[in-house]
Amino acid sequence: MKSSIEPDFWKHKTLLEMTDAEWEALCDGCGKCCYRKFIEGHGKRKKLYYTRIACNLLDLETGRCTNYAKRFQLETDCTKLTKKNLPDFHWLPPTCAYRLLNENKPLFDWHPLISGDPHSVKKANILIKQGIHEKDVIDWFEFVVDGH
């Protein structure tokens, strides 16, 4: 049986041309999209803040969802990133494969599709350190990582 993922597919296919399996394979498993963000201000003064506050389903050690199949039922504000709504997600981290390819940029060497190592994200220190689950947080401002 032929694999549904072609070698180096991201180099010659647009995001819209990718199969569902190829689309899913783009995720490096950093988990950063599962960390809470908030926006402060309006217009030119609007600023996006990233936090160390994770969705309650995120495994903080692996950066993977603990219930990926049912994530939308269990976490009503879970973000569904699709080929059609990708342009709306300008807040994705600059290391995100979806964002990189949408901006016509190459993947980083540590990306599992390049390295061949599913643990390369952790080895490259891309995972957020000292994450905390949302259910354990009282004051979000204590957990701001940076703002853009």
UniProtKB/Swiss-Prot annotation:
Q: Which Pfam family is one of this chain's hits? A: CxxCxxCC
Signal peptide: which range, if any? none
Q: Which residues form a coiled coil?
A: none
Q: Which domain of life is it from?
A: Bacteria
Q: Which InterPro entries match?
A: Puta_zinc/iron-chelating_dom, UCP006173
Q: Which HAMAP family match?
A: UPF0260
The family note in this entry says: Belongs to the UPF0260 family.
- Could you identify this protein by its name? UPF0260 protein PM0539
* The organism of origin for this protein: Pasteurella multocida (strain Pm70)
